[in-house]
From Swiss-Prot:
The protein's name: ATP synthase subunit b
A UniProt-annotated Pfam family: ATP-synt_B
PANTHER family named in the record: ATP SYNTHASE SUBUNIT B, CHLOROPLASTIC
Role according to the record: F(1)F(0) ATP synthase produces ATP from ADP in the presence of a proton or sodium gradient. F-type ATPases consist of two structural domains, F(1) containing the extramembraneous catalytic core and F(0) containing the membrane proton channel, linked together by a central stalk and a peripheral stalk. During catalysis, ATP synthesis in the catalytic domain of F(1) is coupled via a rotary mechanism of the central stalk subunits to proton translocation. Component of the F(0) channel, it forms part of the peripheral stalk, linking F(1) to F(0).
Length: 187
């Protein structure tokens, strides 16, 4: 601060000399570069110090507040992101557990359905076998009945042909004796 006052005092002295030179002969030009630079620097520094301190202070204060706000917002977003990540991980774990439960349930249902289909197939096969056996027995009974009818028809045809030709006396006597014996009589 003392240096600044010294510079101000020198600037005033130089300014006074310029004023005296201008009063003597009018407007004068100082050709001493070092003196003019010091005066210019002193004026600029004074203006900057007086007016710039407030502007610079306000700018720095605003910038600091903006940085603090940005840091707080970033920290808040980071905390929110961490919270959302934790929630998402919990939801993922729940979804994986649910998917595993659904998969196990589907496997159990598939196994149960497979067993039910196999059991139904076994019942259907047995029913078809029984139906086939019943059809086979019915066909066999029908074939036997047809054979009996045919045998009876052939036997009747033979008997008729023999009856038309007449029965021999010996065969007639044997037939009569046999019929009487069956009725319970004696010959």
């Amino acid at each position: 601060m003392g240096t600044f006052l010294l510079l101000m005092a020198e600037a005033s002295a130089v300014g006074g000399e310029l004023a005296e030179g201008g009063a003597e002969g009018g407007f004068g030009l100082n050709t001493n570069i070092l003196d003019t630079n010091l005066i210019n620097l002193a004026i600029i520094i004074t203006v900057l110090f007086v007016f710039g301190r407030k502007v610079l202070g306000n700018t720095l204060k605003t910038r600091r507040e903006n940085i603090e706000t940005a840091i707080k917002n970033a920290e808040q977003r980071a905390a929110d992101a961490a919270k959302q990540l934790k929630e998402a991980q919990q939801k993922l774990e729940q979804a994986q557990a649910e998917a595993e439960r659904i998969k196990k349930s589907a496997q159990d249902n598939a196994q149960t359905a497979g067993q039910a289909i196999l059991a139904q197939a076994a019942v259907d096969i047995e029913r078809l076998q029984e139906a086939g056996a019943a059809d086979l027995n019915a066909e066999l009974d029908r074939a036997i009945a047809q054979l009996r009818q045919r045998v009876v028809a052939l036997a009747l045809q033979k008997v008729e042909s023999e009856l038309q030709g007449g029965i021999a006396d010996d065969a007639q006597k044997i037939l009569i004796d046999r019929s009487i014996a069956q009725l319970g009589g004696e010959v």
